[in-house]
Amino acid sequence: MGTQTNKGFFYDEFLKVLKEQQVDVRLMARDSEKDAAISAHKRILSARSEVFEEMFESDKYKASSKLETITLSEMKHEVLEAFVDFTYSDGSMLSEKAKQHAMSLYSAAKDYEIPRLWCLCRKELIASLNMSNALRVLQLAQIPYDESLSVAAFTTIKNSKLKLSSSTKVKVFVVNHPNGPLEITRAIFPRN
């Protein structure tokens, strides 16, 4: 147990047992293999997410005593693993795996109404902003509008204006967001 505290060891063992016993739902992603469903507990998912709470309170799931498998088609398997791991964590920080999938988890946190995950992903996205991901982050911040994330992305774009003009990512962004160029221009050249 060299580097792990007793509390950490207990917590890890507790989660292992919890995930393996009395499972009442299995989750799959759009690209999950048939036998790769992730075991979970409705109560834990419901405690973290209002969407899951409403889903599991519906007659379809409430009346069923069999082990249900739910496909979350908007997520890839690796993202779903990080998503479920977060629901079983203390919610104080993102795991390294979650940090790798911060954009996808940010969207999932919005979709499944998990405010703490949404906030942590926003912080990670802002901390990792650079010219290669600024347009994608800006796009992500638009629906629903997230002012903090949008401002951070605009600032990154503004500071990288010379590289921006020839980027193919800009062309794709313009097609998907017709008002985007105007907003970017205003950010780069503010009126005095």
Curated annotation (Swiss-Prot):
InterPro entries (UniProt xref): At1g01640-like, BTB/POZ_dom, SKP1/BTB/POZ_sf
Cystine pairings recorded for this chain: none
Record domain BTB: where: 23-96
Entry-linked CDD domains: BTB_POZ_ZBTB_KLHL-like (cd18186)
Keywords, comma-separated and alphabetical: Ubl conjugation pathway
SMART domains in the record: BTB
Domain notes: The BTB/POZ domain mediates the interaction with some component of ubiquitin ligase complexes.
Full protein name: Putative BTB/POZ domain-containing protein At4g04090
Organism annotation: Arabidopsis thaliana
